[in-house]
Curated annotation (Swiss-Prot):
Subunit structure: Heterotrimeric enzyme composed of a catalytic heterodimer (DmsAB) and a membrane anchor protein (DmsC).
Transmembrane segments: none
UniProt protein name: Dimethyl sulfoxide reductase DmsA
UniProt source species: Escherichia coli (strain K12)
Annotated Gene Ontology cellular component terms: dimethyl sulfoxide reductase complex; outer membrane-bounded periplasmic space; plasma membrane
Residues engaged in binding Mo-bis(molybdopterin guanine dinucleotide): 172-176, 205, 244-245, 270-271, 291-293, 386-387, 390, 488, 512-513, 701, 707-709, 788, 804-805
Length: 814
């Protein structure tokens, strides 16, 4: 029988020690993603086994945040209040069938998000300085009027290019409520009705890998489904940590473990931090200095080339630039990859295992052993997460890592992979149309603070402006919907604070959110949004292996306080801006949903009727091809199915990158190269700055949060405390013991947080889980453990992306 947790427990202030006592779960088990604390310690598959009160309703909802999974939630409601949360109980719960999509501990804590004391209750306008969090309550009518009047004024004075939609992924999985990419949001639809807005490209998650592998494979680099690992003999993960980032029953970690049980594939994890993806399930962990993955690959490639472990036939048929046979005529002599690795290229340095060892910290004999294993084991699933690319040299590193799959001919086959992150099967479900943006100009999503500060100085060749040679105006208005990148998730918080404090620069900031986040405190107008539990929507899957699904995210309870849906807000603004009919097309939110669902049923005939789906809660469909294999058609017939690269082949040497390197204006230390070489980038461990700041600081996705979402849920914070991870050798030098308060600092800021002394970190490296809520004192010393106090706003060379894992710091005991 289901054990229901008393409301008194749910409502209580929970200390870490008290949580252990309350749930009877201690030590490592408490933090395990396999548990659903404190809601249930037993998985129940059949609804009939759960007794419900006569006045209790069970309504389907969803967790729609940006974790890489989307999970169904079954809300138990009594008298209009959510009492407790369960997850998917449909299907045969067989890995090879329509298995259950079980939510992790984050999704199961949704009740605590809905009833959180941080909930925004009514519209407010700022009365203090930005960032102080001082607001006064206003009516919805006043809020709409202020926004509409000022937006019209700014468009008249500066043009639509001065209006910017900031990055926000808090409701990434929604259809009506979708918050990213900006062009797919209801705010974008509103702005498109009013003349458009300044767009952005790239994202904080994957800017460098998207740009880097575009020059290798053409477009977004696809990967094999993780379910295809059942055909693999070897799994190699570079900075890929699905055990924490995509840890639900609908996510990659489930497929990884289930598939490995079938194939018994060896798994090697290459990461500065021993992650939960390992946790005893891996066969080998190879710790590596952050930002040196390309050097490791080059050392591996040296062994594979000199010992004839490469797939020469694959390289000759499918690739450009491996050796002189396929090198473009425009390239310099010995400009090919093989020459670079063997030391016959321009630098004259052979990339031996000993050379790589000095850079990476990986012993040379281990590099030789790993090269031989990868080169002689096929098929091999070689993949990279998005941690290695979040560096100053991230674009070029992603191209280097993919070389292991290319050199061994593992691309386009079952059990192999492209070297990118895993792919998945998806259904063609129709989302809300947002019309066309009349403004063609866009900037990197990471450069918006510069666009406020020096917009008209930003150019295409220096700053990556797209659509025109330069910006004409600075950003004067920001829409910040369902996102915390206004301050918390954007790098170099102290610089951002200084820029946003001056309201003569960016004159209007509108924040739409459910909670008083760190970013919400910088709003001029603050609008309270409904949670996913307070409105109707569809939630679509993400990293879902070879079983795609759609969730009916029904309205569970009435909107709390004065909260409104994003559709109602934007419709009311459209009315004041004179574009109501164009925006709504005469439909309510539910009418739009029924309209989109009817279109989706045409594309997916197996979908039930709208009302049947509402009762059913989730629709699942397995990939009819069995396993998704990236670039399979290209492998089978490269002439009939060319890639979208200029050559139609895999471009090891990219003439397009050579042209960019010759024309762009780059600061000293930035490198763009036609080959996937190793370059340290700025602020690496080799930087002279390491004499002052001798530790590398990297980030990771912590299992208690999804970026900053769920960062204010008490039980999750208690179960998985925010701590700085440090190796015992580095701690001993500084007199630091486990649990000590430490200060982490560099020229950009200072953070005070407890230390976690653990051999799970490589010596010379410390780590902070990203997404902790920024909590500064009067001196702007952060007490919340927010890594972005310490990160830099200097962008990466090619993507102009966030190098969040490229940081040098010092650590001292407080």
């Amino acid at each position: 029988m289901k054990t229901k947790i008393p409301d008194a427990v749910l409502a209580a202030e929970v200390s870490r020690r008290g949580l252990v006592k309350t749930t009877a779960i201690g030590g490592l088990a408490m933090a395990s993603s396999a548990l659903t604390l404190p809601f249930s310690r037993i998985a129940h598959a059949v609804d009939s086994a759960i007794p419900t009160k006569s006045d209790e309703k069970v309504i389907w909802s969803a967790c729609t945040v940006n974790c890489g999974s989307r999970c169904p939630l079954r809300m138990h409601v009594v008298d209009g209040e959510i009492k407790y949360v369960e997850t998917d109980n449909t299907g045969d719960d067989n890995y090879d069938g329509l298995h259950q999509v079980r939510a992790c501990l984050r999704g199961r804590s949704m009740r605590r998000r809905v009833y959180n004391p941080d909930r925004l209750k009514y519209p407010m306008k700022r009365v203090g300085a930005r960032g102080e969090g001082k607001f006064e309550r206003i009516s919805w009518e006043e809020a709409y009027d202020i926004i509409a009047t000022n937006m019209q004024r700014l468009i008249k004075e500066y043009g639509n290019e001065s209006i910017y939609l900031n990055y926000g992924t808090g409701t990434l999985g929604g259809t009506m409520t979708r918050s990213w990419p900006p062009g797919n949001t209801l705010v974008a639809r509103l702005m498109n009705c009013c003349g458009g807005y300044l767009n952005h490209y790239g994202d904080y998650s994957s800017a460098q890998i998207a740009e880097g592998l575009n020059y290798t494979y053409g477009g977004w680099a696809d990967g094999n489904s993780p379910s295809d690992i059942e055909n693999s003999k070897l799994v190699v993960l570079f900075g890929n940590n699905p055990g924490e980032t995509r840890m639900s029953g609908g996510g990659v970690t489930y497929y990884l473990e289930q598939a490995r049980q079938k194939s018994n594939a060896r798994m090697i994890i290459i990461d500065p931090r021993y992650t939960d993806t390992g946790a005893g399930r891996e066969d080998e962990w190879i710790p590596i200095r952050p930002g040196t993955d390309a050097a490791l690959v080059n050392g591996l490639a040296y062994v594979m080339i000199t010992e004839n472990l490469v797939d020469q036939a694959f390289l000759d048929k499918y690739c450009v630039g491996y050796d002189e046979k396929t090198l473009p005529a425009s390239a310099p002599k010995n400009g090919h990859y093989k020459a670079y690795i063997l030391g016959e290229g321009p630098d004259g340095v052979a990339k031996t295992p000993e050379w790589a060892s000095q850079i990476t910290g990986v012993p040379a004999d281990k590099i030789i052993k790993l090269a031989r294993e990868i080169g002689s084991t096929k098929p091999a699933f070689i993949s990279q997460g998005w941690g290695p690319q979040r560096h100053a040299n991230g674009e070029i590193a992603t191209r280097a890592i993919s070389m292991l799959a290319i050199l061994t001919g593992n691309v386009g086959i079952n059990g192999g992979n492209s070297g990118a992150r895993e792919g998945s099967y998806s259904l063609p479900f129709v989302r809300m149309p947002t019309l066309e943006n009349p403004i063609q100009t866009s900037i990197s999503m990471f450069m918006w603070t510069d666009a406020i500060e020096r917009g008209p100085e930003m150019t295409a060749l220096r700053d990556g402006v797209r659509g025109k040679d330069k910006l004409d105006v600075p950003i004067k208005m920001i829409w910040n919907y369902a996102g915390n990148c206004l301050i918390n998730q954007h790098s170099e918080i102290n610089r951002t604070h200084e820029i946003l404090q001056d309201d003569k620069k960016c004159e209007l900031i509108v924040v739409i959110d459910c909670h008083m986040t760190s970013s919400a405190k910088y709003a001029d107008i603050l609008l309270p949004d409904c949670t996913a539990s307070e409105q109707m929507d569809f939630a679509l899957d993400a990293s879902c292996g070879n079983m795609s699904y759609v969730i009916f995210n029904d309205q569970v309870i009435k909107p709390r306080f004065e909260c409104k849906t994003i559709y109602e807000m934007t419709s009311e603004l459209a009315k004041r801006l004179g574009v109501e009919q164009q925006f709504t097309e005469g439909r309510t939110q539910e009418e739009w949903m029924r309209h989109l669902y009817a279109q989706s049923r045409e594309a997916i005939p197996e979908l039930p009727t709208f009302e049947e789906f509402r009762k059913q809660g989730i629709f699942k469909k397995r990939d009819p091809q069995g396993h998704h294999v990236a670039y399979k058609a290209f492998r089978e017939d490269p002439q009939a199915n060319p890639l979208t690269t200029p050559s139609g082949k895999i471009e090891i040497y990219s003439q397009a990158l050579a042209d960019i390197a010759a024309t762009w204006e780059l600061p000293e230390g930035d490198v763009i190269d036609p080959l996937p070489i190793y370059t340290p980038g700025f602020e690496s461990y080799q930087d002279p700055l390491n004499k002052q700041y001798p530790l590398q600081l990297t980030g990771f996705h912590y299992k208690s949060r999804v970026h900053s979402t769920y960062g204010n849920v008490d039980v999750l914070k208690a179960a998985c405390r925010q701590e700085m991870w440090i190796n015992p050798l580095d701690a001993q030098k500084r007199g630091i013991h486990n649990g000590d308060k430490v200060r982490i600092f560099n020229d950009r800021g200072e953070v005070h947080i407890e230390a976690k002394v653990t051999p799970r970190m490589m010596p010379g490296v410390v780590a902070l889980g990203e997404g902790a809520w920024y909590d500064p004192d009067a001196k702007r010393v952060d007490k919340g453990g927010c890594i972005n106090v310490l990160t830099t706003q200097r962008p990466s060379p090619l993507a102009k992306g966030n190098p969040s894992h490229t940081n040098l710091v010092q650590v001292e005991k407080v």
